[in-house]
């Protein structure tokens, strides 16, 4: 191992250790929170291009037509492999049109395909795949002149590998398949062996090569899309090493390792020549930029028991540590290597303040949810051992399967090779790593943090009912609005106002007439009452005539 590699490993270890000191891993494990070792963050924002021209048929001048039949049969095999690929490329080029803006200066014209306008003829809107294909097509057209030159050079030379440098700094590597075999074995054998033997030997080698070609390059030669380029395809078939191609780029060795480990060397077929039996691959090598002082941790949690109840800490799946600040990380579009996460952009996400305090060791701030089913994990691996909730689970130790009794004051139990050996969790048995250590953190009291709900609630039916109700209410409101609008329009006209005034006047006259009539009736009643109550002089009328019978009797 070289000195630079040793220094890099030491630097990485120190960086990881210094960052882990900020997150109390042992303390968090007591509430079931498991924090794995952090990894670096690298951004893959752009890429460099390389072109590989594969010459599938070797240059060989066979005397007396020796081996011609085998070459023809081999070409027929290649036709069945390459013709569909050629047809797909022609279809792609017919659907995608590229307009290159060219600026003319005192020097040579400069083509700007970073400003290319990509459109589609048959399809109205360009999709992401079409845009990618259009960019690859534009780059292929830019390199077509150089590729044509090296094709001619391949035909004239007997070398198995050719390399040219483009004016813009890109390299085109020409790999001539089977050429070394032809140079070293077939040509010398022509003068020593009979034609049939030489042709048979050549045919066997060509068939073997075709089989290896179809196997190793099946992902690239089976589609016009972008696929990972394997190391075996280049090293075994074409006598080249991908690390040599990568070494031409000024990259750190750790970046090269991450690129190879994550299979980020992408190859796309951009040209198929059925006359010369040559295939051109556009190889993209990402450019990585490490973000200094940033680490990403994978986090998980198991249930823990406290105060006789089972709880589960809600924590992000990934945590990012930037200097003195913590946050979540969305690594959905990232690729994980052994030492780093390679992301197309910064994956940082904001997390609540209580989660930050929880990750920094204040377990009383950890948001928790009460466990009501068995879907929450009950154990996890940590430091070569196992951390488990042995109150909610059945834990055993050793080959005798001795039950583990967890102290009620402790949230979880740590089982290692030293104190347990053979570990059993709910019937699952496993052996701990001999180098594992017991992770303990004092005897401090663990407090339950704020309770939150992380269970997904299905409210689709309620939402549907509410939506229907709102739609019906909207219809009724529109009807009411129409009625109000109709009612509100008639009283604003001038004729209606005049009619209202006349009606009011008539009503006033009628009311006045009624009042006058009532007044007269009342006055008449008053006069009648006064007449009956006044005194009357009574006179008695006596007859002046005497009764004749009375006078006679007196006499």
Curated annotation (Swiss-Prot):
Residues bearing carbohydrate: 100, 241
Extracellular-side positions: 22-496
Post-translational modification: The inactive precursor F0 is glycosylated and proteolytically cleaved into F1 and F2 to be functionally active. The cleavage is mediated by cellular proteases during the transport and maturation of the polypeptide.
SUPFAM superfamilies the record matches: Head and neck region of the ectodomain of NDV fusion glycoprotein, Virus ectodomain
Disulfide bonding pattern of the chain: 66-195, 334-343, 358-366, 390-395, 397-420
Residue ranges, Cytoplasmic side: 518-555
Principal subcellular localisation of the protein: virion
Membrane topology according to the record: Single-pass type I membrane protein; Single-pass membrane protein
Pfam families listed in its UniProt record: Fusion_gly
Ranges annotated as spanning the membrane: 497-517
Subcellular location: Virion membrane; Host cell membrane
Record GO biological process: fusion of virus membrane with host plasma membrane; symbiont entry into host cell
GO cellular component: host cell plasma membrane; membrane; viral envelope; virion membrane
Magnesium among keywords: no
Cross-referenced InterPro entries: Fusion_F0_Paramyxovir
Residues flagged as site, Cleavage: 112-113
Subunit structure: Homotrimer of disulfide-linked F1-F2.
Function per UniProt: Class I viral fusion protein. Under the current model, the protein has at least 3 conformational states: pre-fusion native state, pre-hairpin intermediate state, and post-fusion hairpin state. During viral and plasma cell membrane fusion, the heptad repeat (HR) regions assume a trimer-of-hairpins structure, positioning the fusion peptide in close proximity to the C-terminal region of the ectodomain. The formation of this structure appears to drive apposition and subsequent fusion of viral and plasma cell membranes.
Family per similarity comment: Belongs to the paramyxoviruses fusion glycoprotein family.
Official protein name in the record: Fusion glycoprotein F0
Species this protein is from: Human parainfluenza 1 virus (strain C39) (HPIV-1)
Upper classification of the organism: Viruses, Riboviria, Orthornavirae, Negarnaviricota, Haploviricotina
């Amino acid at each position: 191992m070289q000195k630079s590699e040793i220094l890099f490993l030491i630097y990485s270890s120190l960086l990881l250790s210094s960052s882990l000191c900020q997150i109390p891993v042992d303390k968090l494990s007591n509430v079931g929170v498991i924090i794995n070792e952090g990894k670096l963050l690298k951004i893959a924002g752009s890429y460099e291009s390389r072109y590989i021209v594969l010459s599938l048929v070797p240059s060989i001048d066979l005397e007396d037509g020796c081996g011609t039949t085998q070459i023809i049969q081999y070409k027929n095999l290649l036709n069945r492999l390459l013709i569909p690929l050629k047809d797909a490329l022609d279809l792609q080029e017919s659907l995608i049109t590229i307009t290159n803006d060219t600026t003319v200066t005192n020097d040579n014209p400069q083509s700007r395909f970073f400003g290319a306008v990509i459109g589609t003829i048959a399809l109205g809107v360009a999709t992401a795949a079409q845009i990618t294909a259009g960019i690859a097509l534009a780059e292929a057209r830019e390199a077509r002149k150089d590729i044509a030159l090296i094709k001619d050079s391949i035909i004239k030379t007997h070398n198995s590998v050719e390399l040219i440098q483009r004016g813009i700094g890109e390299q085109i590597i020409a790999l001539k398949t089977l050429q070394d075999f032809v140079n070293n074995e077939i040509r010398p054998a022509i003068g020593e062996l009979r034609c049939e033997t030489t042709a048979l030997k050549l045919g066997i080698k060509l068939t073997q090569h075709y089989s290896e070609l179809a196997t190793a390059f099946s992902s690239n030669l089976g589609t016009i899309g972008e696929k990972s380029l394997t190391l075996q395809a280049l090293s075994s078939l074409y006598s080249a090493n991908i690390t040599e191609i990568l070494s031409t780029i000024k990259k750190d060795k750790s970046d090269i390792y991450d690129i190879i480990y994550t299979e980020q060397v992408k190859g796309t077929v951009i040209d198929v020549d059925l006359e010369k039996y040559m295939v051109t691959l556009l190889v993209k090598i990402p450019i990585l930029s490490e973000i200094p002082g940033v680490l990403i941790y994978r986090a998980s949690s198991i249930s823990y028991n406290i105060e006789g109840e089972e709880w589960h800490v809600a924590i992000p799946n990934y945590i990012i540590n930037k200097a003195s600040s913590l946050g979540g990380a969305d690594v959905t579009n990232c690729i994980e290597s052994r030492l780093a996460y390679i992301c197309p952009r910064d994956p940082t996400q904001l997390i609540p303040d209580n989660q930050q305090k929880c990750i920094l060791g204040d377990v009383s701030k950890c948001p928790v949810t009460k466990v009501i089913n068995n879907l929450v994990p009950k154990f996890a691996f940590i430091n070569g051992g196992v951390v488990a909730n042995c109150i909610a689970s059945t834990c055993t130790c050793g080959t005798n399967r001795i039950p583990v009794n967890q102290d009620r004051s402790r949230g979880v139990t740590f089982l290692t090779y030293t104190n347990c050996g053979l570990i059993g969790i709910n019937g699952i048995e496993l052996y701990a790593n001999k180098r594992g250590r017991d992770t303990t953190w004092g005897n401090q009291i663990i407090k339950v943090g704020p309770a939150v709900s992380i269970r997904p609630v299905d409210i689709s039916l309620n939402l549907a009912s509410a939506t229907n109700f709102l739609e019906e209410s909207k219809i009724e409101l529109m009807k009411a609005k129409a009625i109000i609008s109709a009612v509100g329009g008639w009283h604003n006209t001038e004729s209606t106002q005049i009619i209202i005034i006349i009606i009011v006047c008539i009503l006033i006259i009628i009311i006045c007439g009624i009042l006058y009539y009532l007044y007269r009736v009342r006055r008449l009643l008053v006069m009648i009452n006064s007449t009956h109550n006044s005194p009357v002089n009574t006179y008695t009328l006596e007859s002046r005539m005497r009764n004749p019978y009375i006078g006679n009797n007196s006499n």
